[in-house]
Amino acid sequence: MKKLYFLFILYIHTFFLASCGSDSNEEPTIPEPEKPSYITGINAIVAPTGTFAKDDASSTLDGSSAKNVARLLEKAGPDIIKGMGNINITEAQYKEIKTFTDKLVEGKDTEMNVYREIFKWITTNINYASGYVDNDPYPVFQTKQAICQGYANLLTVMLHSQSIPSMVANGMLVNVGGHAWNYVWLDEWYVSDPTNNGHSRMADFESNKHLDPMSLDAVLFEDEHFVFNFYERHLNLRQVKQSGKQLTVPFSTNGFKVTSFNPDTDLPSEVEEIYIGKNIDTLGESIIGLNQHAPSVKYAYVDKENKKMESYGQVVYRNEIPYYVPASAKTIQFKNIATFGKNFLVDHQHVQTVVIQPGTKTLEAYAFENCPNLQKAYIPEETKVDGNAFYKVHSSFKITRGIVKD
């Protein structure tokens, strides 16, 4: 346990008295303000020792989302579809749908004709629901009621039963709202929208301009270390299969720049440090996977050339707000930020000590919430701490006023 040393610099105040005697009207000089207390030995800032991925001049996906998806799928090919993605269906349910589909397409001699028969049956028999319905494929098959997600799920299952590759896409129906549709392989990629009875070649961007894909329910690329998908309009590092203590996020895969690191499975337990290169634009928007899937990480560092985010200490910031705080960090020294608003740091289970920088004016109520192991906060004397700024922290929590010297 490192000792804390408090260095108090005291001033000797000398009072000058007039030489002409006790009847002088001169007042003693006003002492200078006390200089701040300094705290040493915290060791909150740990310099990175690993490396960032180097720019390899890979291709940037800088077109429309639909064109970016087309480039990725053309590169990946149909073999990426090895199953039905995240569709929820039991073996018995799948068998029943397959038996029905086998009879439906009996006599159809080409994959295109099989597809057309299945597509026709869905668009003719499934009705768009006005209220809540279960959009898993089997309930849709049984009730003949669905919204767009149910249409797309059932189409994928029925095509899969006939060995035709299909994946579900989620995104936006332009000027309408959220939508789901399919990408289907029939000697080339097709866009299939059973909800709206739409079907066209993927390369026909004019016919598909009303569809704006955000995510695909399929793995695009995979190697011995990493798995990649298309998520939130980015080529995303979805899974890290193996790594040492220091994880360098790759710059590219299969000739395309990787711009997102948002895993949906746990990182290897060995990973304690993450090195995020200048290529990464996002760690997630609606869901930040590192918050849930990086339990052993203590430090995250961002390349200084990254224009979307930065790191200070072990914390990643975006727009002056903590974007990612490693789950296993125990001592955290934050950037100089004027105001720590509500939920500045919330639900962190391992942090024990936080250090606030000079220049921070206010810690608002509930700035730190539900951090059960947080026991110490080092805060400059001039920083205002609102009531309940530290809420649901350790029972022995204590604030020490002073400035931590690196």
Name each region found by the language model.
Residues L7-F16:
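Bacterial N-terminal signal peptides
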Residues F15-I42:
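Bacterial Sec-dependent N-terminal signal peptides
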